[in-house]
C-alpha cells in the first residue's frame, strides 16, 4: 500500500469517529488579501511522515513569536503523521489568518476547518483526483474559505489553474509518492504558471535566496514549516528577503 492509500484509509477511520464541528465564532478573513504582494506563511508542524520535528515548542508561543513577521499561519490538524489538532487553528487565529492543512477527502473536514476558525483549507489534488478536488474546492468557497489546491506536477497545476473563483494553487516541492523534495521542479512549475493563477510554493524552503526566487516568479507567498519550527528566528531573514524582492519586482 503506497503512502497516499495509507493516508486515505487513515482519514476514513478518523471520519467514522470525529465529532460534529463547533459553530464558528471567529471572524473570516480573506486569506489571499492577507498575503499582500508576497507573504511568509509560517507553519506549526510538530511532526511529519519522516518523524518528529519538534515537540518542545507550544503552539501559542510559536504563533506569538512569529506574528510580527508572518503574513499567515499554516496549522497541521492531522493527528497520526503530523501530531496535529484542530484546536491549533483556534490558537493561531488571534495572531494571523489560518490555513488548515490536512488530508482532506470529505466536506466534513472542511466543516471542521470552518468551525474552528480557519480562513483557508488545503486540498491535495493527487490525493483525491480532479473531480473530488473540484467538489471540495467549491464547497470551501461556499463557506467563504480560500481553497489552496496542492499540486506537485505541471499537468495537475495547469488543470487546477482553470478553475477560477478564489482557488489558489499550492505548488508542492515534495513528490507525494516518494516524499522527495525538489525546489527546482516547483520553481519550473511556477514559471510555467506565471500570470495564470495565484499560487504559493510549499516544502523545502529554508533560505532567503529561495524566498527571493519564489518571489521573483510572482508567487503570492511561501509556506515554511520545518525550518521555522527548528529555528523560529529564521523568519526575520526570510521576511527581509521577501520585502527586498517585492521592492524590486
From Swiss-Prot:
- Gene3D superfamilies in the record: Aldolase class I
EC main group? lyase
Keyword tags:
Amino-acid biosynthesis, Aromatic amino acid biosynthesis, Decarboxylase, Lyase, Tryptophan biosynthesis
By its UniProt entry, which PROSITE patterns does this protein fall under?
IGPS
Q: What is its EC number?
A: 4.1.1.48
Into which family does the record put it? Belongs to the TrpC family.
What is the protein named? Indole-3-glycerol phosphate synthase
User: Which species is this record about?
Assistant: Pyrobaculum arsenaticum (strain DSM 13514 / JCM 11321 / PZ6)
What is this organism's lineage? Archaea, Thermoproteota, Thermoprotei, Thermoproteales, Thermoproteaceae
In the UniProt record, the gene name given for this protein reads trpC
Amino acid at each position: 500500500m503506497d503512502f497516499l492509500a495509507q493516508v486515505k484509509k487513515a482519514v476514513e477511520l478518523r471520519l467514522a469517529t470525529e465529532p460534529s464541528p463547533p459553530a464558528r465564532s471567529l471572524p473570516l478573513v480573506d486569506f489571499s488579501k492577507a498575503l499582500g504582494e508576497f507573504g511568509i506563511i509560517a507553519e506549526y508542524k510538530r511532526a511529519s511522515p519522516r518523524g518528529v520535528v519538534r515537540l518542545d515548542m507550544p503552539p501559542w508561543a510559536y504563533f506569538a513569536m512569529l506574528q510580527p513577521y508572518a503574513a499567515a499561519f499554516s496549522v497541521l490538524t492531522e493527528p497520526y503523521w503530523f501530531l496535529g489538532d484542530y484546536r491549533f487553528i483556534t490558537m493561531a487565529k488571534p495572531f494571523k489568518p489560518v490555513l488548515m492543512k490536512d488530508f482532506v477527502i470529505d466536506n466534513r473536514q472542511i466543516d471542521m476547518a470552518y468551525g474552528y476558525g480557519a480562513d483557508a483549507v488545503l486540498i491535495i489534488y493527487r490525493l483525491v483526483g480532479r473531480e473530488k478536488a473540484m467538489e471540495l474546492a467549491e464547497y470551501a468557497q461556499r463557506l467563504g474559505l480560500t481553497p489552496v489546491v496542492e499540486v506537485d506536477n505541471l499537468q495537475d497545476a495547469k488543470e487546477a489553474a482553470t478553475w477560477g473563483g478564489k482557488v489558489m494553487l499550492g505548488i508542492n516541492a515534495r513528490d507525494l509518492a516518494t516524499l522527495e523534495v525538489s525546489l527546482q521542479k516547483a520553481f519550473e512549475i511556477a514559471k510555467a504558471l506565471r500570470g495564470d493563477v495565484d499560487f504559493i510554493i510549499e516544502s523545502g524552503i529554508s533560505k532567503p535566496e529561495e524566498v527571493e526566487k519564489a518571489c521573483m516568479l510572482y508567487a503570492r507567498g511561501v509556506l515554511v514549516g520545518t525550518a521555522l519550527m527548528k529555528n523560529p528566528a529564521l523568519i526575520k531573514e526570510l521576511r527581509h528577503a521577501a520585502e527586498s524582492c517585492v521592492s524590486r519586482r
